[in-house]
Amino acid sequence: MFYRMIENKRNQWLSSPDCTITSLIDYIVKTGQMRDAQIEAIKTYLFLKIACEGKPLATLFKHGAFNTLDLNALELSQSTRDYLISHPSAAALFEYVCMKNDNDEQVSAKLEKAIKKTPDSIDYNKVWNDTFYGVSYTDYLFSLPMGAGKTYLMAAFIYLDLYFAMNEPHNSAFAHNFIIFAPSGLKSSVVPSLKTIQNFNPSWIIPEPAATDIKRMISFEVLDQSKTEKKSNKTKNPNVQKIANHQPLSELFGLVAVTNAEKVILDRIQEKDGQISMFEESDDEKDRQANELRNLIGKLPSLSIFIDEVHHAVSDEIKLRAVVSRWAENQTVNSVIGFSGTPYLEKAEKIKITDDLAVGTAEITNIVYYYPLIDGVGNFLKRPIVKIAEVADSSRIIENGVRLFFDTYKDTVYDGGLVAKLGIYCGTIEKLEEVVYPIVSSIAAEYGISSDAILKFHKGNKQYPQPADGQMQFDILDKSISKIRVVLLVQIGKEGWDCKSLTGIILSQEGDCPKNMVLQTSCRCLRQVVKGTPETALIYLNDTNADKLNAQLMQQHHIWYCQVFFANSFLIK
């Protein structure tokens, strides 16, 4: 709910004479290339950078930067009113605990009463430091659902920072260099992230000639190569070489490095019981090289660190914060900008206010912007039709789902010649080869579709080797040359799979995907193909996966599919 205070103050600023970005926002809207979710995020980003000078959230809340309550209009004792007026950090906490959520539930009536009674009994500075994890650096999190265009939004932030930094090179609010941590759990996410950012057209958000000038300045680096050759302990870390090539680092401007935090930045770091060891005194060559890279990145001036899919890095969060805190000691870190699909924690946390009082929050506290998943449906996401099979037999569910898909989407061809595709998750390679493929190929033949239009995509085992051209066919699914209509998968494509022409998903049994990934897997088919065009997609589930989908929607987005998210859901016998 802290983001609501930020949004309220942002809106006040945008409509005030102090706002300096009105013409820029008008330009972005006029170009028509950015989604509403992205434009609203840009407004918040620039508000925090310009009006709030890019300061850490704890500092801003202590200074009352987001206070909007008219204390003179509230029923307060004169002493309490005077205290809150003269102590903006207290007024900020008071405003927060008085807020109500979408269910009209107040954050904390108890705390409101306590502040009214004895406002000087709370250490407000400590509360705000604890609320935002005690970090000394700027750490903002943007929560947007899948399909909102988070990677393009990163690119927009990069270009906007450089645009303002060129005009005000000594303004510390704007970053000069950037490192992007691609999702830690996705091994193949680094290069696609880089390509998406490289393909971004800065003239969508910045007028010419500045857009082209900045694009020419940017240099890209992928930090993903192996550390050393096996037979050498003297070979230099190639990632270090890539950064060192940009010497002198003190004058560096416009570097965009993309890497996998887990495999590169957090390499050779151990965490035990909250204690971090970076083996800085180690004689081990791999330890030395890992630290060499970290130390060099820590010298990049005015560095903004972008973390994609923050929820992936939960197990590595302590390590990552330790590394960033070490970099921040050099006074080189401009900010940490995170991106996540959900604002909600797995379980609520307590923020201690006094020995007797605490306030619970189910949201990640450093979220500065939140775009609900439900607002994306029918906007930049296809409108899903969810079918829940009453029968338990996996083969029958697949058979019925494939027939329904072909009945509905057999002749669907999107702009650009992309044919609609169905994804079926199979659990095991044996099931894919021995059960699912025969069923699908038989039904496809009935509809006049060749078996060549069925892609078997898995990594292979002793009995069934990896299909020879499987990876190539998978990589071109979203191109007009692909004639694939059905993709059979085993433990691949659960997340980070960006295929807009995917128009249906079948999960026929428990184990087709990890239990905690049913929502992400089901929603793979919801990315919109043509902007502004009403599109639908089929999600066909057995009852177990439907229950998990519902539970994960409730946990991660606080919505229930039969009531709100999926208007077209049916029980199929």
Feature roles, as predicted:
Residues 169, 321-323, 327-443:
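Interdomain helical connector at the RecA1-RecA2 junction of SF1/SF2 helicase-like NTPases
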Residues 153, 171-213, 262-263, 427-433:
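Conserved Walker A/P-loop ATP-binding site and its immediately adjacent core
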Residues 13-143:
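Conserved pre-motif I regulatory segment
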Residues 263-264, 273-331:
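SF2 helicase catalytic motif II
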Residues 58-60, 148, 209-243, 250-258, ...:
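Conserved C-terminal RecA-like helicase domain
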Residues 460-562:
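Conserved RecA-like P-loop NTPase helicase motor core
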Residues 180, 257-260, 306, 334-341, ...:
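Structural recognition of the conserved hydrophobic beta-strand(s) that form the central parallel beta-sheet
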Residues 150-164:
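Motif I (Walker A/P-loop) of helicase-class P-loop NTPases
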